[in-house]
């Protein structure tokens, strides 16, 4: 059997003046993933369809400048805190911390200079039947207002069976809050929109949100709502504005509460279990998301408006992709009804998310 390999080439210059590297992981069986050291961006994810034709199933931009100046987090690693923190503040152990607001009066994805804007150190390696690159980042005490120095690793690993895994670890020297994720935009057809895709989410509940994206209260059961994706549903039917929550967001931009969602950031990762299954029209490609995380933010690219172009000159339009962000719950640092997102010294944050392509094994 062919063995996975790792390759490297330069990919432009970051705003800091540092050279951005592109690391290409090849499975040896047709899949490949390209990762940038700027933002830890998953730049391409090439996947064969049932006919053997390979397309990238993630949106990407043409240059580092586009990612740095225009990108709505396309493909990036998100931290220190994925999703929103209400009013850009939270209280931990009696001290209130303030995060710069960058989304309708709230802190989104770690603030305006989150981990998606940083240069990550890269170390490639191969082990067994996997090719991998380990990215590392040191976030100093007070970075974007968050307490404690945080050392983070994010390891992308591609194996010969066609699974792309993303594993995070983080350790701190002071109590802090942590939620890390990848913000790739998926389109399994490689072109067009995702209205013809079907999506299944293995979750009994979701978090309704206010107009500004902040959870408005406790989780609500999905039964009888547009958010019931416990069986495969056509996305084009579900992102129509018939439901008030969907109309308000312009589609899905909500967090589903996955089964067994009792994970704390300062403990071992939860059980790796399936969170979602996304299927392209005609089942030409199928992707399953497996994760140890408690929440899945489903975002149907509601704010894309055609002003961004990918490397082929294609305009990225509304609903041209769907994000499946595995994470802790939005605004959990301010919510007693959510599992804790607090990480304390001596504990290690750990999470794993797999992107699997079962159509390749049938």
Protein language model features and the residues they cover:
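An exposed, glycine/acidic-rich loop-and-rim segment of catalytic or binding clefts
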Residues: 1-362
